Structure formats: structure tokens, C-alpha cells
């Protein structure tokens, strides 16, 4: 029986402008009449003529409204000329798995249902983003096109009576107004696990994890935080690498993440940190809701900053078979990320790129063959195996480094610092501040730091003096396509390489989040306590930015 396409009249909603990684709003916003339909229709239309006969991947992190949205996307895609959908079972796919599937199946792109590390549940957040045919987040030009369509939309297309059960793996074919349309519901983890087996030496890692190679099993604590990674964690760490059941926790994806805030940092992954601090563990790791972020801690909860994690993996990349085979190209980091990887790149003779915040900025460099490893201070690490950051990949990389060196995490870091020096780093987040005063703060600070007399000025605190070398509102010209991104964050660089960065974040769903980044480099004094080493620069940053005055906050919501 041929199913018919229905054209439904609609009106634009204000504010459907995708941020750094898609559109994130409260569930109550997405469930307004036609709200999700409008945005998905805009995504489909933005693909233009390429949409007809195409294959798309659909899946998300399992948060509240994920399954309903996935089923809605099936009905909209059928009506808009898509030929085939690959849908994760129950609508579940990690963001790295979507990227891998797009590339493996040469799909036109993927619609990812996630608000990443933001809380889930009926009162919390939902999100939709589009990944392009390279597997990476849509670039600015594409998301701007989506937004333009949302402001002008008058109708969307729907096959209302298309029935599909996405809880069962299998292929279902339909006739949509005389054209074939196929929905393949796939095992959420199979393709991704195969991909990891191609990158890492699972046999060697299994011998290391089980203790067969060393006589002592690797004691790990992997916390999926009730996000999408649960089933991936169980298949890889338990079934493939032979870890014990007690090595993994919170591995059932839940619509509200079991009340957890799936953001892998010292504040929200406190349960993991406390457990590893008090127990006998070699490595602890946590992931966010959609599986692209990771936090690594060593024995007794020794914290590895994301910038140090990136630098250490860069130093040991050739311990991973994928890089032995494909070679090591350049490295990159987001601008606010401490510059530890720059020092590794310099030593190894590799290009190092500094890009704006947002994983999409790494994609062009990867596609051009100039970049194979990159990371962000916001707990994102990844390589050119896909075009997204990848939490599980990062943990497998760390276990590979531990196996290769025969050392624990703290010793690996101390050896690294003895060679390269140490970037002490912290980030202060002031969440859900009033937007207008925050914008005024940034404007005032920009005026201060771009005044001609600011460069050369010295600031002193806690017995340390820092002299300003340069200061600006960071802008970036893509070396590949020459596109320009401006106003990416205020930064002050001092003569010793230390830095202060202030940004307003675009990933929250309400209010503004002010992020203050402090990066202090020490060549010799590498074993100090981070909070003590950073305090002078933090005090200077609060003085220059006048942050307490504008936000009304005397302390950050989160310290990382």
C-alpha cells in the first residue's frame, strides 16, 4: 500500500538558531505544536537537491523525548524524499557512533538527538543537531542556512500514518507516493565496536586489562552516568577486554540520567572521584550523556586535565596501531584549552592549530589531512577516525598508553611534565547568569584589553607579576576554506605564556554561562598544588574582568 505525503501549514518560531552543537532548549519548548517539525523540516530542506534518494543516520543519547523525536524524524524524512534511514535501536546512538556510521555508510549526514552534558527529563533539556557527510557537526554556513529557513517556514511535509517500531532491529520497506523508502533499525553498538577494534589492539589490551600480561588485573572504574555509553561500555570493557562487572557503573541509559548531571567533571562526577580516591583503582573514567566527552583520573583520584590528556596522548600516539598504520599529522586544540599540546607538537615537528570552541572547526583540517588529534578543555578528545570527539576512544587511548609504558597515570604525567613543563589550568563556570549584564561585562572588558596602553601593562598578585604581551577578541581564519570566525573569546596572553580567557558559552538552554579560563605555564615548578599555583592569576582575572560586579556572583557554579 502506498502511503501519502501530507503538507501541513505552520508558522515560524523565534529562536531556532543552532548554537555550537545544534539547537538546545527545554523539553517543554520542543514539544510545542510543530516546534520540532519546523526545525527538522529546516534541516532536511537545507540539504537541497542532495536530499532526494539520500541515506541519513538518526539516533540520540536516550534522554526524555528521544524516541518520540526519532519516530517523528522517520515520518518527516519519508515525506521529504529521503531514500533510507539508519536508526539506532530505541533511537539510541552515541554521537561518536553516529559520526562513524555516517562515514562507514557514506550517508548524506545524521540527525543527532542530544543536549550533550545538559540534564535530561521532562523539566530539563533536549537538543537536535545535524552532522554532515564527513561525519562532523554542520559548519556555520550550514547552520545559518537552517536558521534562515526556520524564520520563513510556512509548511512541513509528513507521512502521518507511517508506523515503525524502532525497538526491534530489522529492515522495513515502504512505498511513499510511489517511491521506495527503507528504515533499517540497527544494533546501536555493533558498528562502533568494530571501528574501535580496527584502531586499537584489543588482544593486547585484553591481556593487559585481565592481568594476563602483567600478573595483576587493571583495576578500573568506568562511569557511564546513565547516559548513552552504557551499552558501549559493557560491550567493549566487559565483553571484549575482560574487565569485571564491578568495573562499570551506571550503564543503563535513562531518560533523566537517573537524576545525574551527565557532565564528566570533578563536580558532577563526584561519585566516581570519591570512589576512586578511597579505593584501589588504576584508572577511573566518566562520560557525558551522548558519549563524546570524557574525564580521566588515576589512582587515588589523581586528576588529569583535558589539556594534559591531549598532550600525553599526542606524545604516545604511535603506541596505537591506527597511527602506526596511518601516520601522525598535526595536532589542534580549542583556543581556551591550555597549550600543553603545542609543546609536544613543537618537539615532534608537527603542525599545531588553535581554533575556536566547537568541534566543527577541527573537521576541515582533518579532511585536508593536516590534523589527526585534537581536544578541548571541556573534556573533549578525539582523532581523525571520525569527525566528533569520542569519550570511549580517549579511555582506550589512555589504557594503550598505560600498557605501552607500564606506568600508572600519575607517573606518566610527572614524566611528561619533567620533559615539557606544566600548564596549570582551571576553568570557572558561572551558570545561568542574566544575559544583559554578561554582555555588558564582555563589552567593557574588550574595550579595556584592546586599548593601546594595555599591552605592556603589569599586574601583580600573590608575589607574582605578569606582563601583558598581547590581548584581543580571538578571531580565526580557517587555513583550508579561508572562512572567518570572529568574537570567539577575550584573551590576554602574558610574556611567560600564561593566559586569561573569558567567554560566554553558547551551549546552555537558558541564561548565559560565563566561562573564565586560567592557564599558567611553569617550566620547573611542576609538582605544585594547582589551586595555589593559579590563585595569583585568578585574582588578576577577576580584577580585570570585574566579573563579580557584573554577574553578582562571588563564586563560580563549577570549578574544573
Curated annotation (Swiss-Prot):
Effect seen on changing residue 64 to Y: In strain: zim_36H
UniProt-listed SUPFAM superfamilies: Phosphoglucomutase, C-terminal domain (SSF55957), Phosphoglucomutase, first 3 domains (SSF53738)
GO terms assigned for molecular function: magnesium ion binding; phosphoglucomutase activity
UniProt EC number: 5.4.2.2
Temperature-dependence annotation: Pgm-A is more thermostable than Pgm-B.
Outcome of substituting residue 52 to I: In strain: zim_36H
Result of altering residue 240 to L: In strain: dpf95_38.3 and dpf95_4.2
Binding site for alpha-D-glucose 1,6-bisphosphate: 24, 116, 292-293, 357, 376, 378, 389
Cofactors that this protein relies on: Mg(2+)
Protein family according to the UniProt entry: Belongs to the phosphohexose mutase family.
Subunit structure: Monomer.
Listed name of the protein: Phosphoglucomutase 1
Species whose genome carries this gene: Drosophila melanogaster (Fruit fly)
Annotated gene: Pgm1
Amino acid at each position: 500500500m502506498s502511503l501519502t505525503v501530507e503538507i501541513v501549514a505552520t508558522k515560524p518560531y523565534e529562536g531556532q538558531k543552532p548554537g555550537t552543537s545544534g539547537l538546545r532548549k527545554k523539553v517543554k519548548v520542543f514539544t510545542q505544536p510543530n516546534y520540532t517539525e519546523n526545525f527538522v523540516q529546516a534541516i532536511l530542506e537545507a540539504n537541497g537537491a542532495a536530499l532526494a534518494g539520500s541515506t541519513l543516520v538518526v539516533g540520540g543519547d536516550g534522554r526524555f523525548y528521544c524516541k518520540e523525536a526519532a519516530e517523528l524524524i522517520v515520518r518527516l524524512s519519508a515525506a521529504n524524499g529521503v531514500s533510507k534511514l539508519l536508526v539506532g535501536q530505541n533511537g539510541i546512538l552515541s554521537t561518536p557512533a553516529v559520526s562513524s556510521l555516517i562515514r562507514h555508510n557514506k550517508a548524506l549526514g545524521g540527525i543527532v538527538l542530544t543536549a550533550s552534558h545538559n540534564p535530561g527529563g521532562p523539566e530539563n533539556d533536549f537538543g537536535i543537531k545535524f552532522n554532515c557527510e564527513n561525519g562532523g557537526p554542520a559548519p556555520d554556513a550550514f547552520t545559518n542556512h537552517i536558521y534562515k529557513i526556520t524564520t520563513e517556514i510556512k509548511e512541513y511535509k509528513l507521512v502521518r500514518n507511517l508506523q515503525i517500531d524502532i525497538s526491534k532491529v530489522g529492515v522495513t520497506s515502504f512505498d511513499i507516493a510511489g517511491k521506495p523508502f527503507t528504515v533499517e533499525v540497527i544494533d546501536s553498538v555493533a558498528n562502533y565496536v568494530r571501528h574501535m577494534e580496527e584502531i586499537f589492539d584489543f588482544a593486547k589490551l585484553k591481556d593487559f586489562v585481565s592481568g594476563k600480561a602483567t600478573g595483576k588485573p587493571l583495576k578500573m572504574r568506568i562511569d557511564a552516568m546513565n547516559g548513552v555509553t552504557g551499552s558501549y561500555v559493557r560491550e567493549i570493557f566487559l565483553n571484549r577486554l575482560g574487565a569485571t562487572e564491578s568495573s562499570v557503573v551506571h550503564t543503563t541509559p535513562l531518560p533523566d540520567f537517573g537524576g545525574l548531571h551527565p557532565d564528566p567533571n570533578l563536580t558532577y562526577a563526584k561519585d566516581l572521584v570519591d570512589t576512586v580516591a578511597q579505593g584501589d583503582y588504576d584508572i577511573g573514567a566518566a562520560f557525558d550523556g551522548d558519549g563524546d566527552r570524557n574525564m580521566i583520573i588515576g589512582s587515588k583520584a589523581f586528576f588529569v586535565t583535558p589539556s594534559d590528556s591531549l598532550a600525553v596522548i599526542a606524545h604516545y600516539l604511535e603506541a596505537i596501531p591506527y597511527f602506526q598504520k596511518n601516520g601522525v599529522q598535526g595536532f589542534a586544540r580549542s583556543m581556551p584549552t591550555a597549550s600543553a599540546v603545542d609543546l609536544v607538537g613543537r618537539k615532534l615537528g608537527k603542525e599545531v592549530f588553535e581554533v575556536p570552541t566547537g568541534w566543527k572547526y577541527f573537521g576541515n583540517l582533518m579532511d585536508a589531512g593536516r590534523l589527526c588529534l585534537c581536544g578541548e578543555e571541556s573534556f573533549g578528545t578525539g582523532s581523525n577516525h571520525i569527525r566528533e570527539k569520542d569519550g570511549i576512544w580517549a579511555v582506550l587511548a589512555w589504557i594503550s598508553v598505560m600498557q605501552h609504558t607500564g606506568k600508572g597515570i600519575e607517573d606518566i604525567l610527572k614524566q611528561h611534565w619533567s620533559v615539557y613543563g606544566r600548564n596549570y589550568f582551571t576553568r570557572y563556570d558561572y551558570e545561568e547568569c542574566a544575559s544583559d549584564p554578561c554582555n555588558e561585562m564582555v563589552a567593557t572588558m574588550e574595550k579595556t584589553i584592546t586599548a593601546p596602553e594595555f599591552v605592556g601593562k603589569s599586574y601583580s598578585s600573590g608575589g607574582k607579576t605578569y606582563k601583558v604581551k598581547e590581548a584581543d577578541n580571538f578571531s580565526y581564519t580557517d587555513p583550508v576554506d579561508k572562512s572567518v570566525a570572529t568574537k570567539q573569546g577575550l584573551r590576554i596572553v602574558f610574556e611567560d605564556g600564561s593566559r586569561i580567557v573569558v567567554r560566554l558559552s553558547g551551549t546552555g538552554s537558558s541564561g548565559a554561562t560565563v566561562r573564565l579560563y586560567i592557564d599558567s605555564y611553569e617550566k620547573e615548578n611542576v609538582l605544585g598544588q594547582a589551586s595555589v599555583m593559579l590563585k595569583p592569576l585568578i585574582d588578576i582575572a577577576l580584577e580585570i574582568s570585574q566579573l563579580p560586579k557584573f554577574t553578582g556572583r562571588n563564586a563560580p557554579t563549577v570549578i574544573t
